[in-house]
């Protein structure tokens, strides 16, 4: 097998990514635009901003909070995911609980979601299954 040609192939930062540490259990990104990486275990990861790309890889995260507009997040397993805003896209390998407040958000989870709560319109959630769910608003698509 050939050696990786960039650090992004081995889970490290991509050429344009800024690495964010987890100080006192919290990794926070507050920005308008840019690409960021969290790669260490963290109790809480908070993204506040617009047009931000965030990768959360190789890390265990208890709570992932995304606030703002037009953000893109790719994460591994998260215990809880909260989306607040518009037109955000989140992809996760697993999420125990998902809360969406806002409009036009997309959440894709590879595993089943334990609990799902949506307040807003035109949100799309995809997962192979959902335990308990509460959906308020029009035009939402859920499993």
Listing of model-derived features with the role each one plays in the protein:
Residues 2-143:
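Extended beta-solenoid/beta-helix repeat architectures
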């Amino acid at each position: 097998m050939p050696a990786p040609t960039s650090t992004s192939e081995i889970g490290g930062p991509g050429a344009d990514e800024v690495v964010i540490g987890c100080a006192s259990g919290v990794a926070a990104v507050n920005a308008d635009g840019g690409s960021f990486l969290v790669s260490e275990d963290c109790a809480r990861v908070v993204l506040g901003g617009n047009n931000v790309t965030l990768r959360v890889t190789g890390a265990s995260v208890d709570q992932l909070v995304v606030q703002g507009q037009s953000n893109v997040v790719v994460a591994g397993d998260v215990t809880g995911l909260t989306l607040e805003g518009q037109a955000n896209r989140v992809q996760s390998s697993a999420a125990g609980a998902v809360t969406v407040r806002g409009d036009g958000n997309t959440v894709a989870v590879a595993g089943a979601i334990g609990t799902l709560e949506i307040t807003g319109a035109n949100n799309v959630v995809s997962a192979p299954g959902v335990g308990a769910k509460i959906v308020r608003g029009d035009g939402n698509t859920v499993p």
